[in-house]
């Protein structure tokens, strides 16, 4: 079975538990931290999937590493470990955050700009484009890309809004050639 499908099922179960116990904000913060641990430490995942290390030692490692996280998340990680699915943690985190964002009416967006955007500029982008997407707000991550020359390129889901100078130059070039 596809990792994305499996991760979505676990994420949905964790989301339901978080909603019932009113731990949504806390679990979102914790799952982002867990995701970061797995993303930044390839050897950690290798250790958890190492066949010669006993399951009990792997469980102890999870309990020790994630002692500060709430029990629903820690128990989910232990369950994934027991079922040999610990490698889906990044996908599970992504799916969980997507579910939380959908429930809140928030969309994740990436803004590419020639210089870092101020909080006011991010807020203005969020206000304008959230309405276009039918959301209440956008959570914007800013990536500086000097090749854009100026302006902003905004990616929301699978949509790209290109208001960069380099994008405009490319469109003009296509019109002149074609």
From Swiss-Prot:
Which InterPro entries does this chain map to?
ATP_synth_OSCP/delta_N_sf (IPR026015), ATPase_OSCP/d_CS (IPR020781), ATPase_OSCP/dsu (IPR000711)
Give the superkingdom in one word. Bacteria
Q: Which PROSITE patterns match?
A: ATPASE_DELTA
Instruction: Tell me how this protein sits in the membrane.
Output: Peripheral membrane protein
Please give the chief subcellular localization of this protein: membrane
Q: Which UniProt keywords apply?
A: ATP synthesis, Cell membrane, CF(1), Hydrogen ion transport, Ion transport, Membrane, Transport
**GO MF term set:** proton-transporting ATP synthase activity, rotational mechanism
List the record's Gene Ontology CC terms alphabetically. Answer: plasma membrane; proton-transporting ATP synthase complex
Purpose of the protein: F(1)F(0) ATP synthase produces ATP from ADP in the presence of a proton or sodium gradient. F-type ATPases consist of two structural domains, F(1) containing the extramembraneous catalytic core and F(0) containing the membrane proton channel, linked together by a central stalk and a peripheral stalk. During catalysis, ATP synthesis in the catalytic domain of F(1) is coupled via a rotary mechanism of the central stalk subunits to proton translocation.
Subunit description: F-type ATPases have 2 components, F(1) - the catalytic core - and F(0) - the membrane proton channel. F(1) has five subunits: alpha(3), beta(3), gamma(1), delta(1), epsilon(1). F(0) has three main subunits: a(1), b(2) and c(10-14). The alpha and beta chains form an alternating ring which encloses part of the gamma chain. F(1) is attached to F(0) by a central stalk formed by the gamma and epsilon chains, while a peripheral stalk is formed by the delta and b chains.
Membership in a protein family: Belongs to the ATPase delta chain family.
Name of the molecule in the record: ATP synthase subunit delta
Q: Which species is this UniProt entry from?
A: Geobacillus sp. (strain WCH70)
From which lineage does this chain's organism come?
Answer: Bacteria, Bacillati, Bacillota, Bacilli, Bacillales
